[in-house]
Amino acid sequence: MIRIIGIGPARDDITIRALRALEDSDVVIGYARYIRQIEDLLDGKEVIRSGMGDEIERVELAIEKHREGLDVALVSSGDPGVYGMANVFFQIFDKYSGIEFEVIPGVTAVNYAASKLGAPLHDFAVISLSDILTPLSEIMAKIRAAAESGMIIALYNPLGKRRKRPFREAVEILRSLLPPQTPVGIVRTVDGAPDVRIVDLESLDESLVDMSTIVLVGNVTTYTRDGQMITPRGYAVETPLHELAREFYEENPLGKASGPDENCEFYPCHFEGQNCAFCYCPFYPCAEGSTGGRWIRDRGVWSCQDCTWIHTDSAVECVKRSLGDIISGPDDLMDKKRELLKLRRECLMRG
């Protein structure tokens, strides 16, 4: 049996299934750095180390040992199916007959990085910036498509000592498509504790990354809070409808006329020239901070003091276009909260 084993990105993240697979192996084959990560688990086993770029030779050697009747572990960092040894194994094994194999999944580098950053992943794309095997034009097309679609983007192999062009071109594309304040998570792991930081896209610099780094680029809904990077899914948090909001939507079920309400005694409550069509936000409480709102801690109150989005012309125009399909009166603000939050997300993603 050949077991293609994902050992995870760090020593403490190896799975029980991977441990058992290693225990059942006679021979362990892998890149020298990955072998060091699990060396204490390999007593009494034949261990074969190789260098970077020797992937095909590792597979051929694993098959050779297997045909000798030995159980072989072919180890891969992270998950073997994500830029790991599973892919190259399946390119080679069809040359031979009677090969028994099993793929043992592992914790991927992107999932590990996400766990260190908070909850940055929603719909996301994983893209390697290594152009050793993939044309640079193909990589950049994927970057552009992912950014245009609003996906979170995880970049593997962002920067080599001599391979800098892919990262520079990727950043240029991202900056042309995403707001400069878009959060970017950077997790670098070698042998010790991970180096974790969050910057905005405008500040993303190649001095912060290398080949041991995962870069996670957020989208327009991603925000940061207390050192965590969060991309919300849009769960509906139920709270009672405020009586003033009820009164407003009884009189104005689809909001008031667009534009500033300079006759209001509180105008401007956010900024000069604000659009007052929705004096009371129809999404309250959205309970996610992508537009600046936040919980008043230990009070159970959602504060919109720093959220100006619903008072921008583009937001009002987008919301008015579909709000009538969802609500006909104030009770719908609670009863149809999920549909409302989907509308909010749609308008945010449109920009």
From Swiss-Prot:
The gene is cbiH. It catalyses: Co(II)-factor III + S-adenosyl-L-methionine + H(+) = Co(II)-factor IV + S-adenosyl-L-homocysteine. Keywords: Cobalamin biosynthesis, Methyltransferase, S-adenosyl-L-methionine, Transferase. Pathway: Cofactor biosynthesis; adenosylcobalamin biosynthesis; cob(II)yrinate a,c-diamide from sirohydrochlorin (anaerobic route): step 3/10. This is Probable cobalt-factor III C(17)-methyltransferase. Its EC number is 2.1.1.-. Belongs to the precorrin methyltransferase family. It holds the Pfam family zf-like. SUPFAM superfamilies: Tetrapyrrole methylase (SSF53790). It is an enzyme of class 2 (transferase). May also convert cobalt-precorrin-3 to cobalt-precorrin-4. One of its GO terms (biological process) is methylation. InterPro entries: 4pyrrol_Mease, 4pyrrol_Methylase_sf, 4pyrrole_Mease_sub1, 4pyrrole_Mease_sub2, Cbl_synth_CobJ/CibH_dom, Precorrin_MeTrfase, Zf-like. One of its GO terms (molecular function) is methyltransferase activity.
